[in-house]
Amino acid sequence: MGKIKELETSLANKIAAGEVVERPSSVVKELLENAIDAQATEINIEVEQSGVSSIRVVDNGTGIAQEDLGLVFHRHATSKIVADDDLFHIRTLGFRGEALASISSVAKVTLKTCTDNENGHEIYAENGKIIHQKPAKAKKGTDIQVDSLFYNTPARLKYIKSLYTELGKITDIVNRMAMSHPEIRISLVSDGKKLLSTNGSGRTNEVMAEIYGMKVAKDLVHISGDTSDYHLEGFVAKPEHSRSNKHYISIFINGRYIKNFVLNKAILEGYHTLLTIGRFPICYINIQMDPILVDVNVHPTKLEVRLSKEDQLYDLIVTKIREAFKDKILIPQNDLNHASKKNKVLETFEQQKINFEKQQSQIGETSAPYVHDQKDKNHDVESHKNNLDSTSSTNNESTEVSNELHNHIDDSYLQSQKEVLFDMEQNTSNEYEISNQQSNDIKGTVSQTPHRRVPYMEIVGQVHGTYIIAQNENGMFMIDQHAAQERIKYEYFREKIGEVTNEVQNLLIPLTFHFSKDEQMIIDQYKDELDKVGVHLEHFGGHDYIVNSYPVWFPKEEAEEIIKDMIELVLKHKSVDVKKIREDAAIMMSCKKSIKANHYLKNNEMADLIDQLREAEDPFTCPHGRPIIINFSNYELEKLFKRVM
């Protein structure tokens, strides 16, 4: 008798379900996608015990016809594709017909549905089989309840992390879906606590205000652009709101949340020197394209996709993000009361914390944006209401957020797009204005230059030979003198190095390099890559190589180190990025040739430095992304000294 046997349907379904239903958030994702595909305008999600006990998703979409109910829990039964060619023109979020079959294989599922022309029906399934089907009262749309997840696969429960972590992953999914579909009213409730409620206004920035808080939302900058194949829309937050991981980067293609290394790299390249190493932006990028240019049928979770013309999209993202910040004032507002505010927010959060039985795990920063940033949102909205002496109750928070956004409108975008967005730079044109007479009366000040992003300021002095202190009518400024000159010199060296061709400089004494046998084989294979950039390696016997010349733009004292870096790139990536090498060289030279800490300057030298900084293309961060200027507002100074409460 043969050893190979066909698995029973129930066992095969459980195995297949492992690919689709990894955890409670997987169930929420699949049901939410189905509701969106059903053209719902309102979706309500309720979970208990982070979805382990129950998950309920109610929508007002088209509903499921009675004649189709018998197939809803069958594997590969779908209304979204019919022929092979449909796979290359997918515009729906779901298409495989696996979700409900997989969920019903590992949970108890009750589905109520009603269409426009029929009465309601209820169907109940467990262990992948329909137990009963009957008429039932139901509103138009679909109501799905998933109970006792993994009840028949207890081994899977062992891999469920803390309830806080699982809730974080659920809120992450819901938040991202809400951002990509702002026209849908979406609410999320966990154990009776409302975690998210969007108003369905169609404005993504209002959804981001709900998720990240008003402080971040007011510093969002709109981006938009087109190529022959792609249309790009999105919001990018100012660098001061950066985070310590990539979790806050949200990329969507045709409304589908995806993860893509190349597009992530494009976003970081767009911010370029505005972010320090290890910091990542908050951003929302939505890309519309012909479905034939993207393959979403790569992975069961549909998170990974393959893109055509990826380079074109990369360049578009980089260009639009750089353009977004080109004319913006990016001086971070220092919060002198950050510590006390943080403590108050933490206290508030502790009081509102969801009561999970016997759960003591902490929320990590990698949990959902809601869990991480809701604290800031609660505080920001509350403090803003206090500033306006608002009498609105906290129950109207969604209305409060929506109303606040309408007070910050970018008129130019309103005219072109007929949408309401934030005025990302409200009053920046006159925020730092000062009369010509005042400018002439002040000695030892930096001259005012029109159309420059660095504001007028009067030099006051220097602290520890490191930080320049300046002031204007709006407050006090601290300038890192090393970072300021580093930015100035970086832009100078970047331009000069960029102008130089691959003309080489011959050496009297060659540089010698030794490699292992494995490295030697790679270098011999890819030596042409080094030749293209002016580094000519010659075999010198054994495992030794010599270099008799290198490009004239190499800094003489760093030439050997740069060549080593190039060779490392060849060994690791089988290629050399000349642009990056030149960039790194400019950064290296600017850092070494800039004034250091504990270097005391005269007032006129400080003024000259600020004047030069004003002429810089990006005057707010050094090449490594560290801030150059920090602003202390008059209000914050007065608050520090208890002059205001």
Curated annotation (Swiss-Prot):
GO terms for cellular component: mismatch repair complex. Keywords: DNA damage, DNA repair. CDD domains: HATPase_MutL-MLH-PMS-like, MutL_Trans. One of its GO terms (biological process) is mismatch repair. Pfam families: DNA_mis_repair, HATPase_c_3, MutL_C. Residues 372-387 have a biased composition (Basic and acidic residues). PANTHER family: DNA MISMATCH REPAIR PROTEIN MLH, PMS, MUTL (PTHR10073), DNA MISMATCH REPAIR PROTEIN MLH1 (PTHR10073:SF12). This is DNA mismatch repair protein MutL. It comes from Staphylococcus epidermidis (strain ATCC 35984 / DSM 28319 / BCRC 17069 / CCUG 31568 / BM 3577 / RP62A).
